[in-house]
Amino acid sequence: MAEMNFGGVVETVVTSKEFSLEKAREVLKNETIAILGYGIQGPGQAGNLRDNGFNVIVGQRPGKTYDKAVADGWVPGKTLFSVEEAAQKGTIICMLLSDAGQIAVWPKIKQYLTPGKTLYYSHGFAINWNDRTGVVPPADIDVIMVLLRVRAPRSAQCSLRVAV
């Protein structure tokens, strides 16, 4: 593990040396990873996880990014759902919506953040400024931040690091 300083706060970061892909597959084999949002980060993270053998679903509202998800192989009613339904079905809820989107959808999905679930962020405006946004996770769920290290253009391939 590595100690990293994030804006004056030292965090212990689990790297791929301590937590291999094989170990991740074993630990997460019974989890459903719900990617909420298929805009900037959604396609890369969802595709990376799916291509590496994880159980992934996508939550996206109808529109051009929904159509892109279908074109990318996500199947409506099977692996592609509304944001609310994906939040309900997922055990790991990945908030990859825009900052404004996270704030707007929060009242609709917070009821699905039940004990034992994990809320996952890749950017933290809404949760860090929760006194202004109203995004306050329940005390009985885990909250994590996943930082991406991009190895290819447009997030075609990503290496994930988890800050816990």
Q: What is the role of each PLM region?
A:
Residues E31, G53, K89-T91, G116, ...:
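Short, well-ordered alpha-helix to beta-strand connector turns
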Residues V83-W129:
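Rossmann-fold NAD(P) dinucleotide-binding segment
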Residues V75-E84:
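Glycine-rich, highly charged phosphate/nucleotide-binding loops
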Residues V70-W74, A87, I109-L113, V135-P137:
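Short, surface-exposed basic-aromatic patches at helix termini and helix-loop junctions that form
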Residues A2-V75:
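NAD(P)+-binding Rossmann beta1-loop-alpha1 motif at the extreme N-terminus of oxidoreductases
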Residues Y120-V164:
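Rossmann-fold dinucleotide-binding core
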Residues Y38-G39, Q60, L96-S98, S122-G124, ...:
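Fold-independent oxyanion-binding glycine-rich loops
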Residues N55, K78-T79, D142:
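Conserved beta-strand segments of alpha/beta enzyme cores
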